[in-house]
Amino acid sequence: MKKIVISLMLIVATLFSHDFGNVPEKKLSQIKKDRPLMVMVGKTKCIWCDSMAPQIKEIKEQYPKTVIYYMNADKDPLGAINNNIVELPVQLFYNKEGKEVARHVGYIGKKDLLEYLRTYGVLVE
C-alpha cells in the first residue's frame, strides 16, 4: 500500500511540473544578474506556464548561450512579492547591470519571445 501511495504522489507531481529542459530553476535572490538574462516566472498548476515550457526549452536548445532561468513562485513567494509579481506567467528581462529593463505579463508565443530576447540583448545567436 505504501508503495502505491508513493507511486501515485510521484505521478501527480510529474503531471503538474513544467519541463523547461536545461533551463535552471532558481530563486530570484540566487540569480547572478551580471549579464543580460531572462527569468520566466511561473508556478505549479499554471496552464499558461505549462504551455510556454516547450517553447522556452526549444529556445534554450537552439541558443544555448542565451541566459534563461525559471522561477517557481510557489517555491519562492518572497521573490514574487519583492518583485511585484501578481500575475503569472511573467517574463523578466535584465541588463548586464542587473536592472530589470522590461517585463511581459501573460503567455507569449515563441516568435514574440525571441523578439523580446533580441530587443533586450538577451539572445546570444
Task: Tell where the protein language model's regions lie, with residue ranges.
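Hydrophobic h-region of N-terminal signal peptides that target proteins for export
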Residues: M9-S17
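Positively charged n-region of N-terminal signal peptides that target proteins for export
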Residues: M1-I4
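Short active-site neighborhood of thiol/selenol oxidoreductases, capturing the structured segment around
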Residues: K32-T44
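Typically the conserved alpha-helix immediately C-terminal to a functionally engaged Cys/Sec
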Residues: D50-Q62
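N-terminal leader/targeting and pre-domain segments
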Residues: S17-D34, T119-E125
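Thiol-based oxidoreductase modules, predominantly thioredoxin-like and allied folds used
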Residues: V41, P64-L78
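Non-catalytic, surface beta->alpha helical segment in thiol-disulfide oxidoreductase systems
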Residues: F93-E125
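Structural micro-motif
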Residues: N83-L92
